Design a protein with these regions (language model features):
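Non-catalytic substrate-recognition and accessory regions of acyl/acetyltransferase enzymes
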Residues: 1-97, 105, 112-124, 128-131, ...
């Protein structure tokens, strides 16, 4: 079994094959030039301890998402520091999204990282809004991780296996 990432074309519901690779300085420049919600050139995101990855369509190499992950070996998990869809797939920036499933693919890759590190597949993240918190809980099985911060969520166990499993294929 091997991860085979994809996103969904909103108009046709077709699964479009996508790849995840290390993000580059050119990717970060595009976030400013193409008016992404966040400028990925900031010191916060450019923290050397963050692993930054880009999600792009296999056929066109169109950049559709970026994510920054923090390896947390003492906690035996990975923290999803930040992730974002390109404007064409970001519901905050586009009334009609060209693509869906970008966040799911980036979260699944986040689960792949601790598996690759030998930890299992636990990730945690902080939802930016109540709406996103409910979305992560409803669609990805996230559970509250802290009684002090209801926006801090954990995706582990069956929920992590189910989400990552969506992208596994025999090759």
């Amino acid at each position: 079994m091997q991860p085979c990432y994809y996103i969904i074309e909103s108009q046709t519901s077709a699964k479009l094959p996508a790849s995840i690779r290390e993000a580059t300085a050119a990717d970060f420049e595009r976030t400013a030039r193409e008016h992404w919600q966040t400028d990925w050139r900031t010191d916060f995101i450019q923290d050397a301890l963050l692993e930054k990855y880009a999600l792009e369509l296999d056929t066109t190499k169109e950049l559709v998402g970026l994510a920054a992950y923090r390896d947390m070996p003492k906690g035996v998990l990975v923290y999803v520091e930040y992730m974002e869809s390109a404007p064409s797939g970001n519901p905050t920036l586009s009334k009609t999204r060209k693509y869906a499933g970008i966040g799911a693919a980036l979260l699944a890759f986040g689960i792949q990282l601790p598996i690759d590190y030998g930890y299992g597949g636990a990730i945690y993240l902080k939802a930016k809004t109540t709406q996103l918190r409910e979305h992560y809980m409803r669609n990805y099985g996230a559970i509250p991780f802290s009684r002090f911060d209801p926006f801090l969520l954990l995706i582990d166990g069956d929920a992590a296996r189910e989400l990552f499993g969506r992208y596994l294929k025999e090759v």
